[in-house]
Amino acid sequence: MYWQDEGYLLSKNNFDENSIIIETFTLNHGKYSGIVYGGSSKKQKKKFQIGNKIFLNWSSKGENKTGYFTAEIIKAVVPSFFDDKKKAICILAALSILKTILPEREINKKIYLSFDKLINQFYSENWINKYILWEILLIKELGFEDKVKINNKLDIKEALIFNKNLLLENFMIPNNLQMPFSRNILEKYYN
């Protein structure tokens, strides 16, 4: 089995001496994991930074077998915001939430496209409002639309807490998951 797609790098872990296991969120295939041989080498390391948008080639001997990735970088996302801690932590929070709550190998084009759009919103002045709306869209898209009652009078901190409670109630607690650390840090920036 073989496919090509674009996606964002959600996580990476060392595997063997020079390889890594990456988890990606792709446009046409959803969340996928696989091995990258030589992924921790000096030549390849720069491609595989969490948050990078990459073009992926995935191959496997079977549909349910562990696959192997090769990749080329499309855009280095997080380094663009190293000078702004709030934006960098916000991007990492979004990536961590996607990693935690999205099901493996389930196509979510609307969520992918909304995340891709969110990344471009970090260049605007009201980026935190766009992030809050993105979290609400994510919760709605995953089937909890009836539980989302938006109060437009909330300030940023209250809106982040509101969204956090929705995530906890609908995803984290029922599945015995922890709220991503970066999401908790983001909330603390607005105390």
Predicted segments with their positions:
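Non-catalytic alpha-helical scaffolds and adjoining flexible linkers that form interface surfaces
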Residues: 1-20, 25-191
